Amino acid sequence: MADLEAANINHDNHLLLDQPCLRLPYELLRKNFRSVHYPFEWDSTSVKNVVKETANGLISGKASPQDAVENLDQMLVKMRGLKRKLTAAAKEEDRLYRQMDSRVAHLRELADLHTVDDVRYEAWSRQRLDRLLVDYMLRHGYDSSAIALADERGMRDLVDIDTFVVMSRIRKSLEGGSVQEALNWCNENKKELRKMQSNLEFLLRCQQYIEMMRTDSPAKMAEAIHHARKYITPFTETYPVEISSIAGLLAYRPGTISEPYASLYSASRWQKLADTFVEAHLKLLGLPMTPLLHIALSSGLSALKTPACHSTQLQVPTQPEESQPVNGAGDGAATATAAAASSTTSTAIPHHHHGTASLTTRVCPICSTELNALARSVRYAHHGKSRLLEQDLVLLPNGRVYGKARLDEYAAKSGLPAGQIKDLVTGEVFSGEEGRKVFVT
């Protein structure tokens, strides 16, 4: 019964992971609408006013026919410009709707699946893995590789290449020491950033001021003061401490060791600006800061993680393959005890191998070099049900648990007198009366 439940697909959990897949096109549709809504309202009102003024001027005789023609020409220029904006917005809207249709269809395929044993589930999960890999590469700046994978798998509409390419370009410009593209982005999203209470624009303006102060040119210093009055002073009530610090740069030149001025001149601020931009960009679009691939891996890592996985120096016994303690699923405490207690016949290595099995076949995934750091911050899994690998469990005085049949069999193989039992790992010998029966609830 438990195996059948484990094979069932939990659609709610899948949708939690795939939520950004649907959220981003929706957020981009809203942004696309806002980008043309205000220009449309502004230009429409302007054209109506010009038409009204021209008509009234002709009727009253205050405007000549030549003036009317010039006004009409101006209206035509505005309307043509508005038409170009609306056409571009309509194309973008069609693209986003196409993406949403593809993503809904992709998730609908999952809704039609009920167990992981379905042959269609493997193909679907493989496509999702490819999508998560593309997301990971885009977040880390591997744009060419991400685009190549998306094109090879034919899933352009399932990933957000254009959005992340723009983010990557602006991030690289900040890392290269330029704030202009980031400021343009802030200007496009000024209202949303203000609602988020983001300090990105303030930090960018401060960096412009710092770069002006970095030179010894009196003209540049005068320009920096003018820049501060225009762009930084409006933030006085919000960031008084920061503004006081950057004002002190007038007295402290580059190369100073006095803090906080030395940190303000530090080149590492560019990387901090890039990180702040990425954080604001993802938050604006409702995307998680952690790559979706890490989120997906974390659930599996949590199921496998035990308290012994991040011990700095654990002992791995050199007992034969058959000498393994009984570890049920999720029995992290028993595993940790087993690893720690095996000090008499063991070899010290950096990572443990859960259950003291063969060093070549029983390597814990959590202890692998690739996943150990990622799993460090993952919580231990909650196991609501116990699964017994052996019946009639016996607790030895040293805290280890084994099946009674295996203890008796191992005692016989070891040639022990009747009534004695031997720990399969440590080799400790106990009286059979010292073992306590274990009842798992």
UniProtKB/Swiss-Prot annotation:
<dbReference type="Pfam" id="PF10607">
    <property type="entry name" value="CTLH"/>
</dbReference>
<feature type="domain" description="LisH">
    <location>
        <begin position="125"/>
        <end position="157"/>
    </location>
</feature>
<keyword id="KW-0862">Zinc</keyword>
<keyword id="KW-0963">Cytoplasm</keyword>
<dbReference type="InterPro" id="IPR006595">
    <property type="entry name" value="CTLH_C"/>
</dbReference>
<protein>
    <recommendedName>
        <fullName>Protein FYV10</fullName>
    </recommendedName>
</protein>
<keyword id="KW-0863">Zinc-finger</keyword>
<dbReference type="GO" id="GO:0045721">
    <property type="term" value="P:negative regulation of gluconeogenesis"/>
</dbReference>
<keyword id="KW-0539">Nucleus</keyword>
<dbReference type="InterPro" id="IPR045098">
    <property type="entry name" value="Fyv10_fam"/>
</dbReference>
<dbReference type="InterPro" id="IPR024964">
    <property type="entry name" value="CTLH/CRA"/>
</dbReference>
<feature type="region of interest" description="Disordered">
    <location>
        <begin position="312"/>
        <end position="354"/>
    </location>
</feature>
<dbReference type="InterPro" id="IPR044063">
    <property type="entry name" value="ZF_RING_GID"/>
</dbReference>
<comment type="similarity">
    <text>Belongs to the FYV10 family.</text>
</comment>
<comment type="function">
    <text>Involved in the proteasome-dependent degradation of fructose-1,6-bisphosphatase.</text>
</comment>
<feature type="domain" description="CTLH">
    <location>
        <begin position="163"/>
        <end position="220"/>
    </location>
</feature>
<dbReference type="GO" id="GO:0005634">
    <property type="term" value="C:nucleus"/>
</dbReference>
<feature type="compositionally biased region" description="Polar residues">
    <location>
        <begin position="312"/>
        <end position="326"/>
    </location>
</feature>
<dbReference type="InterPro" id="IPR006594">
    <property type="entry name" value="LisH"/>
</dbReference>
<dbReference type="GO" id="GO:0061630">
    <property type="term" value="F:ubiquitin protein ligase activity"/>
</dbReference>
<feature type="compositionally biased region" description="Low complexity">
    <location>
        <begin position="333"/>
        <end position="348"/>
    </location>
</feature>
<feature type="zinc finger region" description="RING-Gid-type">
    <location>
        <begin position="364"/>
        <end position="426"/>
    </location>
</feature>
<keyword id="KW-0479">Metal-binding</keyword>
<dbReference type="GO" id="GO:0034657">
    <property type="term" value="C:GID complex"/>
</dbReference>
<dbReference type="GO" id="GO:0008270">
    <property type="term" value="F:zinc ion binding"/>
</dbReference>
<dbReference type="InterPro" id="IPR013144">
    <property type="entry name" value="CRA_dom"/>
</dbReference>
<dbReference type="GO" id="GO:0005737">
    <property type="term" value="C:cytoplasm"/>
</dbReference>
<dbReference type="GO" id="GO:0043161">
    <property type="term" value="P:proteasome-mediated ubiquitin-dependent protein catabolic process"/>
</dbReference>
